[in-house]
Amino acid sequence: MTHNHDPYSDAQALKGLTLGQATQYQAEYDPSLLQGVPRKLNRDAIELTTELPFHGTDIWTGYELSWLNGKGKPVVAILQVHLDIHSVNLIESKSFKLYLNSLNQTRFNNLDAVKDTLTTDLSQCAQGEVTVKIIEPKHFTIERISELPGNCIDDLDIEIFDYQFNPEYLLDSTEEKNVAETLTSNLLKSNCLITSQPDWGSVMIRYQGPKIDREKLLRYLISFRQHNEFHEQCVERIFMDLKQYCHCAKLTVYARYTRRGGLDINPFRSDFEQAPDSHRLARQ
């Protein structure tokens, strides 16, 4: 598997994105603001075919959802969106933010009308299955802060000199003994593919198979620090690298990124379990 070729340098699908461009904000409903990015761009580079070796979802949380009710009174809510990974496109985050802003001065008669509109528009942009949940203020208390389950590997006392992405940190990183364990790190950091702005995240790796050397795993995760790719693409890359180099029999990779523009993205990929309930982390 090659990781050196840049699949994005000549990608026409990235040329017209509003991301990284000066933008005028629209306050009235405009679904054309949504922009999709083909998942195929990254999946070709890591040799993923239409028969994906995992299932999963991209879990979005929107903290700045607002519209007007039938009488023109503002309403606020928290948005949760689950986007199935078999969709043709992922949703570009700045366009998602601009689209949500376009609801701010738009009247809806009830909550179902908002939900139906969001479901239709996001599904059309992604060309795939989307599930929308709208959390009203009276239910905000269920949005508790939690931690990713597992053993955090961040306290390992290692010295780092190289911050370039390098999957070969995982070479010869396993023992003969088979284990079932869950490891976490809060040190995941990559950069936006278009703007190079930092993306901060926490990641959970749950696997069954040969025991992975935790120091080598941490070095690998830290090597994303100057890597330019979207959140969803980074998680799929981690999944494929762990499968290739560590020979995991069962594997889940779940990352929760800090929010930008009122939105956070939390990609979940697994070949043996379903996505957990979405609970924000302290940094979100």
Swiss-Prot record:
This protein's pathway: tRNA modification; tRNA-queuosine biosynthesis
GO MF entry, a single one: preQ1 synthase activity
Active site per the UniProt annotation: 192 (thioimide intermediate), 199 (proton donor)
Transmembrane segments: none
Residues the entry annotates as binding substrate: 91-93, 231-232
SUPFAM superfamilies assigned to the protein according to its UniProt record, in alphabetical order: Tetrahydrobiopterin biosynthesis enzymes-like (SSF55620)
Keyword NADP attributed: yes
Signal sequence residues: none
Reaction catalyzed: 7-aminomethyl-7-carbaguanine + 2 NADP(+) = 7-cyano-7-deazaguanine + 2 NADPH + 3 H(+)
GO cellular component: cytoplasm
Enzyme class label: oxidoreductase
Protein keywords: Cytoplasm, NADP, Oxidoreductase, Queuosine biosynthesis
Domain of life: Bacteria
GO terms of biological process kind: queuosine biosynthetic process; tRNA modification
Tagged with keyword NADP: yes
Amino-acid positions noted as binding NADPH in the UniProt annotation, renumbered to this chain: 93-94, 260-261
Subcellular location: Cytoplasm
Protein's job: Catalyzes the NADPH-dependent reduction of 7-cyano-7-deazaguanine (preQ0) to 7-aminomethyl-7-deazaguanine (preQ1).
Similarity remark: Belongs to the GTP cyclohydrolase I family. QueF type 2 subfamily.
Subunit organization: Homodimer.
Protein name: NADPH-dependent 7-cyano-7-deazaguanine reductase
Natural source organism: Shewanella denitrificans (strain OS217 / ATCC BAA-1090 / DSM 15013)
